Amino acid sequence: MNAEKSPVNHNVDHKEIAKFEAVASRWWDLEGEFKPLHRINPLRLGYIAERAGGLFGKKVLDVGCGGGILAESMAREGATVTGLDMGFEPLQVAKLHALESGIQVDYVQETVEEHAAKHAGQYDVVTCMEMLEHVPDPQSVVRACAQLVKPGGDVFFSTLNRNGKSWLMAVVGAEYILRMVPKGTHDVKKFIKPAELLGWVDQTSLKERHMTGLHYNPITNTFKLGPGVDVNYMLHTQNK
């Protein structure tokens, strides 16, 4: 290992990576553990494309891309997409699925901090979906995302609020009652309050543009975007 890479490699939780490695082969199973990600992906994609003024012809980085659900969908919109993840197995699944689908995505196994050291200011759009709550130092990820985007470019984050309601819905409800995601997927202590995320953003060149909640209705079994950021939320920022 190159010695200069060791500090940024510290921002990796190997237990978190192992959780996703164990189920990577089922990433594209529409009825499997990642069914919620497939269900919400059209909402995510629509929000990102609308707020960024379209994706066609743009250079996009998906941080924490996993098996490539969002990365592939952005490539289908005409973007040149790079997917970044530290999980070997999810990336192998992503590469194979892209090959089978005839979609061009460049998948890279390295931390966002490592990538920022080599590719600062090279992306029109950077997305970081449900990744911040899975690393030891989420603020470092925010800083790296700010470094990677071009002036005037867009950076999108999504994560989970930290409060009793989010614990009840995202952990108790989603993992143990509805079994929408595997048990142990989330650790409420790692959830991030919007004020915390905005504080980290304010310490970079990024500026907040819009925030929205992602809501699940268990009665209708549907998802929607709208006001209220008590549980899942998305943040659109722009490089000054």
From Swiss-Prot:
**Transferase is among the record's keywords:** yes
Q: Pathway, per Swiss-Prot/TrEMBL?
A: Cofactor biosynthesis; ubiquinone biosynthesis
Which major enzyme category is it? Answer: transferase
Signal peptide start and end residues: none
Alphabetized InterPro entries for the sequence: SAM-dependent_MTases_sf, UbiG_MeTrfase
| BP term (GO), one | methylation
Alphabetically, the GO molecular function entries are:
2-polyprenyl-6-hydroxyphenol methylase activity; 3-demethylubiquinol 3-O-methyltransferase activity; polyprenyldihydroxybenzoate methyltransferase activity
Catalysed reactions listed for this entry: a 3-demethylubiquinol + S-adenosyl-L-methionine = a ubiquinol + S-adenosyl-L-homocysteine + H(+); a 3-(all-trans-polyprenyl)benzene-1,2-diol + S-adenosyl-L-methionine = a 2-methoxy-6-(all-trans-polyprenyl)phenol + S-adenosyl-L-homocysteine + H(+)
**Could you tell me the EC number(s) of this protein?**
2.1.1.222, 2.1.1.64
Alphabetically sorted, this entry's keywords are:
Methyltransferase, S-adenosyl-L-methionine, Transferase, Ubiquinone biosynthesis
Question: Is Transferase a UniProt keyword of this protein?
Answer: yes
Question: Which residues bind S-adenosyl-L-methionine per the record?
Answer: R44, G64, D85, M129
The free-text function statement in the UniProt record for this protein reads:
O-methyltransferase that catalyzes the 2 O-methylation steps in the ubiquinone biosynthetic pathway.
Instruction: Name the protein family.
Output: Belongs to the methyltransferase superfamily. UbiG/COQ3 family.
The molecule here is called: Ubiquinone biosynthesis O-methyltransferase
